[in-house]
């Protein structure tokens, strides 16, 4: 902001309008103007902002082979998920032995407020419109801290109830992330919370189990209309600027076009 105020950079408004490819404009448009607004001062685009895609609503990954073995349908609500976890723990479809099956794998790391993190229970909290560790705005535009909002009480009470019922990893307070993953890859756990990247992390080792394993993601904590409550972070964290006096500022946009084209058309 200081360097923009001091007139160190050249406006990229014209270069963007004339040179940006349709693909680039479509990407920025998908953020409803938020990314470009972060780099716009007095109506002028003064930088090329990064555009980090949102991870979206959190997912619960479930052992689909266990669901099938117990003739259970995939959960849609928290109540459905609670029932599934109860069935996993009490009926032991993985053959781990009495008292050895973990319903929901968990660790004391990144439990909430860590956007898109493995083990994050933000999707559960979001059902109650609770957003721990996040600065939010209420309907009147007032800023509040999510961790101290009244909605946190109900969300925490549900998680406490699950823990007391033995549906969540009993040793979660002493497990780190790697230790938690070992319960997934070792076949003890039937569920974990995460995001779209589950097949790459942490599931690969679980596929090597004797007899294999099948996992499927589900969107739970749905509202009555099928929607879910979630938050997204600011899409922009980095910027490319062009110094004042540079003869061809449009090159910055053309380089971006080329990089985008190569990424979209990469078949490897």
Predicted regions, residues:
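Extracytoplasmic/secretory soluble proteins
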Residues: 1-268
């Amino acid at each position: 902001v200081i360097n923009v105020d001091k007139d160190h950079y050249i406006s990229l408004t014209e270069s963007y309008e004339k040179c940006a490819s349709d693909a680039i404009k479509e990407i920025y448009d998908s953020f409803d103007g938020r990314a470009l607004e972060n780099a716009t001062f007095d109506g002028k685009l003064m930088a090329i902002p990064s555009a980090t895609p949102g991870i979206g609503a959190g997912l619960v990954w479930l052992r689909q082979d266990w669901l099938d073995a117990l003739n259970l349908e995939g959960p849609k609500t928290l109540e459905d998920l609670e029932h599934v976890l109860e069935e996993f723990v009490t009926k032991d479809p993985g053959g781990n032995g009495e008292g050895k099956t973990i319903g929901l794998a968990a660790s004391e790391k990144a439990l909430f407020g860590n956007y898109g993190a493995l083990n994050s229970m933000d999707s559960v909290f979001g059902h109650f419109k609770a957003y721990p560790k996040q600065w939010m705005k209420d309907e009147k535009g007032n800023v509040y801290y999510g961790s101290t909002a009244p909605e946190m009480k109900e969300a925490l009470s549900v998680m406490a109830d699950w823990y007391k019922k033995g549906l969540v990893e009993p040793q979660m307070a002493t497990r780190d992330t790697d230790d938690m993953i070992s319960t997934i890859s070792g076949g003890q756990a039937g569920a974990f919370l995460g995001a779209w990247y589950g097949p790459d992390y942490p599931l690969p080792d679980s596929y090597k189990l004797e007899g294999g394993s099948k996992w499927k993601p589900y969107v739970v904590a749905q509202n009555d209309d099928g929607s879910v409550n979630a938050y997204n972070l600011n899409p922009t964290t980095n910027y490319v600027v062009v110094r004042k006096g540079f003869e061809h500022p449009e090159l910055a946009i053309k380089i971006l076009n080329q990089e985008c084209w190569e990424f979209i058309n990469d078949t490897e």
